[in-house]
């Protein structure tokens, strides 16, 4: 992860002092600025499943386990000095010395800044960031286990109709952004997310028509906001997770396929969701001695209160409607037109911002939009064994302008508002018309 200078907009250089190992603050095109770090994820798991079937009834039971390992390496922080008998954390890089310049009357008229290498003397030996013992600032591995339990059954009512039921529980390791902060420190209060899910459905199959209808009910507990918050404990700033943030996802989904003619088919989908946060909490923090953390300035208990009960979950359209029409003029060609409509789409937001008079308030609702895509293909039979398939797609056929993503009350806007409306949000516009082409050779 890094930022890179790619356009100086007519300037000769920029000044950036974020790299604590820099030999110069002057940066030009191609130089990395602001931050430069790697997040490394090591994942392992085990899977087991038992299945049963007697023709009419089939069932399964699944049990899996996982381990997520996280490590962070920062290339801009001072290096660690790793010796046989001790380690100095983030100790060796460069520092700036400033020499003030005064005139004959003692007035300050300027200053000279000089980059110097940090030096540590240990047992009579001097070390700098260029020493072999100076290592990149990196964390230890943080391993977080998780597991999944799933079970389900399907019953065939007859040759065309069946019903099914699925149950599951998931203990999920948090995201990397909720494990290590930008200072290579572990978050406070790292806990797994837990997901309990129920799905009930019905399917129909025939030679000309098929459909699937399913209903879902998912309880998502301990879903921390991405990046957490900053708290100061014992005069040290920490990033902390806000645990106890729960959400309920429920909805209904339908997909169908109908063969209108031998060379003309229709497909459709409908998804209607009702996803809401269900939490109203006051969260307190604890220090390493398990004592309640106090504000170093006021002495008050460090706590965060929020009211997100009933607030719509953001960052995904909760209603989708779509259909496609596929026509095959010959046995080796096809044309497919696809339409999709998106609605009930709310800007992403931080639930812990819902305090005081903003408690229980929905984020800004992104305007609904629809997209049309065109796909076509042709198969060439080169010989008895070889076949060439060509595909062409035109996505967003009519070059629709729409908002594909938004952040509610974004504090990084040039002018920041907290009014839960369009002017308070930052947005990403969706991609315009674009073409893709592919070729596949079977031999």
Residue ranges and their predicted role:
Residues 1, 61-67, 165-169, 213-217, ...:
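Transmembrane beta-barrel strands of outer-membrane/channel proteins
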Residues 2-32, 70-140, 177-186, 225-240, ...:
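Solvent-exposed loop segments that connect transmembrane elements
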Residues 28-220, 271, 326:
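Structural signature of Gram-negative outer-membrane beta-barrels, strongest in the C-terminal barrel
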Residues 46-52, 151-155, 200-204, 215, ...:
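Residues on the lipid-exposed face of transmembrane beta-strands in outer-membrane beta-barrel proteins
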Residues 53-57, 67-68, 75, 217-219, ...:
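Gram-negative outer-membrane beta-barrel transporters
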Residues 56-59, 160-163, 208-211, 263-266, ...:
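Repeated loop/turn-to-beta-strand initiation elements of outer-membrane beta-barrel proteins
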Residues 221, 266, 341-353, 378-443:
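C-terminal beta-signal and adjacent terminal beta-strands/loops
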Residues 314-384, 398, 406-407:
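C-terminal beta-barrel architecture of Gram-negative outer-membrane proteins
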């Amino acid at each position: 992860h890094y930022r890179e200078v790619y356009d100086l907009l007519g300037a000769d250089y920029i000044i950036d002092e974020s790299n604590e190992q820099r030999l110069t603050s002057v940066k030009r095109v191609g130089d990395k600025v602001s931050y430069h770090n790697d997040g490394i994820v090591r994942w392992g798991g085990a899977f087991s499943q038992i299945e049963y079937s007697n023709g009419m009834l089939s069932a399964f039971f699944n049990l899996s386990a996982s381990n997520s390992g996280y490590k962070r390496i920062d290339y801009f922080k001072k290096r660690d000095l790793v010796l046989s008998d001790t380690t100095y954390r983030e100790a060796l890089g460069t520092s700036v010395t400033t020499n003030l310049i005064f005139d004959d009357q003692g007035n300050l008229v300027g200053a000279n800044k000089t980059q110097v290498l940090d030096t540590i003397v240990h047992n009579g030996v001097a070390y700098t960031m260029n020493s072999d013992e100076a290592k990149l600032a990196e964390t230890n591995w943080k391993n977080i286990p998780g597991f999944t339990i799933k079970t389900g059954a399907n019953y065939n009512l007859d040759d065309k109709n069946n019903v099914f039921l699925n149950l599951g529980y998931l203990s999920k390791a948090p995201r990397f952004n909720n494990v290590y902060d930008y200072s290579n420190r572990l978050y406070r209060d790292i806990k797994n997310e837990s997901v309990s899910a129920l799905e009930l459905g019905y399917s129909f199959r025939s030679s000309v028509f098929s459909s699937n209808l399913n209903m879902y009910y998912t309880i998502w507990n301990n879903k921390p906001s991405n990046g957490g918050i900053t708290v100061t404990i014992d005069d040290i700033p920490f990033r902390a997770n806000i645990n106890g943030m729960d959400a309920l996802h429920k909805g209904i989904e339908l997909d169908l396929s109908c063969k209108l003619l031998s060379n003309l088919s229709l497909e459709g989908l409908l998804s209607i969701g009702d996803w809401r946060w269900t939490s109203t909490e006051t969260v307190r923090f604890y220090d390493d001695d398990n004592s309640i953390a106090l504000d170093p300035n006021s002495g008050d208990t460090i706590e965060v209160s929020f009211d997100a009960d009933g607030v719509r979950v953001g960052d995904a359209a909760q209603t989708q409607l779509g259909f496609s029409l596929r026509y095959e003029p010959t046995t080796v060609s096809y044309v497919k037109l696809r339409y999709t409509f998106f609605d009930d789409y709310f800007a992403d937001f931080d639930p812990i911002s819902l305090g005081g008079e903003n408690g229980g308030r929905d984020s800004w609702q992104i305007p609904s939009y629809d997209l049309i895509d065109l796909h076509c293909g042709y198969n060439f039979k080169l010989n008895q064994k070889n076949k060439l398939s060509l595909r062409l797609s035109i996505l967003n056929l009519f070059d629709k302008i729409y908002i594909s993503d938004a952040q509610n009350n974004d504090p990084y806007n040039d002018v920041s508002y907290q009014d839960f409306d369009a002017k308070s949000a930052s947005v990403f516009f969706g991609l315009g018309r674009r073409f893709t082409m592919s070729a596949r050779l079977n031999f």
